[in-house]
Every structure is written in structure tokens, then in C-alpha cells.
Amino acid sequence: MALMLSLVLSLLKLGSGQWQVFGPDKPVQALVGEDAAFSCFLSPKTNAEAMEVRFFRGQFSSVVHLYRDGKDQPFMQMPQYQGRTKLVKDSIAEGRISLRLENITVLDAGLYGCRISSQSYYQKAIWELQVSALGSVPLISITGYVDRDIQLLCQSSGWFPRPTAKWKGPQGQDLSTDSRTNRDMHGLFDVEISLTVQENAGSISCSMRHAHLSREVESRVQIGDTFFEPISWHLATKVLGILCCGLFFGIVGLKIFFSKFQWKIQAELDWRRKHGQAELRDARKHAVEVTLDPETAHPKLCVSDLKTVTHRKAPQEVPHSEKRFTRKSVVASQSFQAGKHYWEVDGGHNKRWRVGVCRDDVDRRKEYVTLSPDHGYWVLRLNGEHLYFTLNPRFISVFPRTPPTKIGVFLDYECGTISFFNINDQSLIYTLTCRFEGLLRPYIEYPSYNEQNGTPIVICPVTQESEKEASWQRASAIPETSNSESSSQATTPFLPRGEM
């Protein structure tokens, strides 16, 4: 009896000395294109520096990220996760580990696990990653009418998972409908629902609801009482004759009008181009030497000759610094608190970059922040083919005549303006207006790695040669050609000067 009691007490003592692994206690939510964070910890607190930490997808052998022998083991990862994960080990001595998964896609949705093991013991935790994408505002169109019935079609795209689509009547009642759903090449859902209504239908709405996000987007159309008002055939004949005459004279008038309008538009474009060139020439008088501070660069950004930033696939071994960004960013060694300053940045053929200035006191440890003036950033952003500014709480899109690869940045501290120039055609892209406070530093962000098309981002010298090159590129981009080509140029939107 005493032997049995001793054995039980020994087992209890052994069990009480072990630890458990805890992960997220509810599904992790993430939006397509953003990042997700998975946190695991040991309880009670136990140093995990000498342990193996394995994040896996569904089953143990499907490795998302592996930490072993005191370092990451990237060669063990599944191909779809290589270059997209980062293990945060700041608190690993206390048994707390976090994994960040970047650039979420719909294919990432599913079950994930964290397994922590010592030489004689292991535990794991399982959780679910739920991926969501909020689609476009529904577009309602009238596709026709048959026997005094209107046929409506509602379309919305870019959803995940499939949304709940509904037609609703004037009193909010659900209406029966036919629906069709397709998936695009990225796995997102495109939804179409159709409806047939009669005259006097009133206000009809089409809504798409996202279950995970509890978000709903809606559009409405008003069907008037006289939509189907019958007309006599005599009246129809008269109306048709009037329309034909009006169409004939309208075409003649429009041809005359547009021939005059085209000349005015071209003259306006020439004036704006010359005005932008004059502003650029004035800005270049204030050119300053800008060099990058390697101590501020993210570990995946390699700074060479203090002018060039290259995005590496894997992070470099860099010394710890309070000045270093956790975003894929770098700032200049120079700071400005007064005066006028101009410099140029060559973004190459990269599809994503951010260029501008930031306050010297921005929180560099915060990885997720809106690059807006409210947070101390004044930047021009390129995302794919879209060029825009972030002005909290809204975005401002701009449409340059020539896609810019080289950007000129002009800061006038006292006037509270920062202007961005397209060096390719010497045009002014946009001017932001704000009241600056404190030190400002030139800022570059290089957010994504592209092995095939990625090129370095370079701080360029401001020289007369660059101005001649820009004039040659502008002549190539905007040739003096026939009227038909000039007309197509004249439809390009003018760029506004913006204020916050």
C-alpha cells in the first residue's frame, strides 16, 4: 500500500513540473492582402530558447515555420510560405512566441498549429485562420423589360467567403431571386442576382452581407410610377422624327464644338506642362545631398553606398538599434526643421513603393500604421498601377500622364507644402499642404520582394543631365502628332493641388 501511494505521489510531482502550450482561443481573422499574427505561449512560463518551435498547417509535417537549435530553419518550410513568415522571439525566454504571416490569400484559410518540444516532452495547440475579403458595392443595372416587367441585375465582386445576397422591397421585405456565383483566379467570389419587378415597385435594394465581418453593403434603385406609361404610336413616330433631326444637328454641332474645344484643351495642357516645368526648375535650385541611414533600415533592406536600397528575400543579421524600423522602411541621415529642400528618388520598375517624408519621432517599432499626416507621414504611394496619397480618413488617387519611375520631392517647411514631381515628363504630380512640426526626414518604404522584377530604389543626384534626360523622355512620351492623337491626350484628367 505504501509503495502504491509513493508511486502516485511521484507521478503527480512529475506532472506538476510539466508545461502546456496555449494558442489563440478563438479563430484568427485576417483580410486578403494583409498580415496575420499567431501567438503561442507556455504555461507556466518556461524558457523556450533551446526548444523546437514548429508552426504547421493542418498536420505536423506541413511546416509553416520551424525554429530549431536556436535559429530559424527556412529550408523546412512549404514553398507557399517561404519569404512570408517572421518569428518574433523577443519574449521566447519567457515562453512566448509569435509568428507573423504576410500577404494573406484565400488559400491560407484553414487549421494551424503550434508544437513546442523539449528533449523529453512536447505539447501543441490548434486554431483556425479565417480569411475574409469585403467585395465591391453592388452595381444595379436594368437589363430589359418583357411584358411590362423590368429585369434587374445586381453584380458585386471580390468577396470571400461567399456573401449572402438579397433583393429587398420598399418595406424591407425579402424578394425571391435567381443567383449565380463564380470564383476568379485568386479564389474570390463574384456574385450576380437577378430580379423581375412590375411597375409601381418603388424603392428596390440589393445587399451583400459578409457573415464573418458582420458587414453589409447595399445599393438602391427607384422604379417610378410612370416607367411603363403607354404612348400612342403617332406620338412615338413624332418623337422618333424629332430625335433623328436632333441627332443629326447634334452630331454636326458636336464636331464643330470639339474641334474648337480640342484646341483649347491642348493649349491648357501645354500651359500646365510649362507651369509644372517652371515649378520643377525652381525646386531644383534647392537640391540637397540626401544619404540613407543604414541603422534605421529594416533587416530585409540592404543599404549600399548610402544611396541605394535593395530588398532581400531573407533578413540580414543586423545589430539591434532603437532607430530601426519594423516596417520595411529606411530614412535619411539628414533632417529638416526649416527651409526649402529638394531631392530625387528612382523607384525603377518596382510595382510597390512609398516615397516622401516622416516626422523624426514616429513610432518605428509599430509595424502596422496608416501612412497619413495624422501619424506623421507625408508620402506618395505606388501599389501596382495605382498611385495615391493616404490622407486620413480618405485616399486621394492621382493619374499622371506618364507613369513615373523617378520622383522629385520638394519640401517647403515654412510654407507647409510638400510637392511631388514626375521627372519622366517634368510634370507636377501633387502638392500636399500641412502645418509641419518638429524634425522631418526623407522616407523610403520598399514593402515587397520580387525576385523577377524587383530593382533597387536609389537616391539620385540632381544634375543638368537628369533634366536633359527628362526633356528627352517627355518628348518621347508626348509627341506632336495628328489631331486624333492630340484628342486622346486631351482626355487625360488634370491633376489638382490638394489640401488636407
UniProtKB/Swiss-Prot annotation:
Disulfide bridge partners, by residue number: C40-C114, C154-C206
Signal peptide residue numbers: 1-17
Boundaries of every Ig-like V-type domain copy: 19-132, 133-222
GO cellular component labels: external side of plasma membrane; plasma membrane
Pfam family, one: PRY
Cytoplasmic face of the membrane: 260-500
B30.2/SPRY domain mapped to chain residues: 270-466
MF-aspect GO terms: signaling receptor binding
Expression by tissue: Expressed in neutrophils. Isoforms 1 and 5 are expressed at high levels in the colon, lung,testis, lymph nodes and thyroid tissue. Isoform 5, but not isoform 1, is detected in spleen.
Induction line: Down-regulated in neutrophils after treatment with LPS and TNF.
Chain positions covered by the region annotation Disordered: 470-500
Keyword Signal in record: yes
Extracellular topological domain residue ranges: 18-238
Known function: May stimulate primary immune response. Acts on T-cell stimulated sub-optimally through the TCR/CD3 complex stimulating their proliferation and cytokine production.
Protein name listed in UniProt: Butyrophilin-like protein 8
UniProt organism field: Homo sapiens
Organism classification: Eukaryota, Metazoa, Chordata, Craniata, Vertebrata
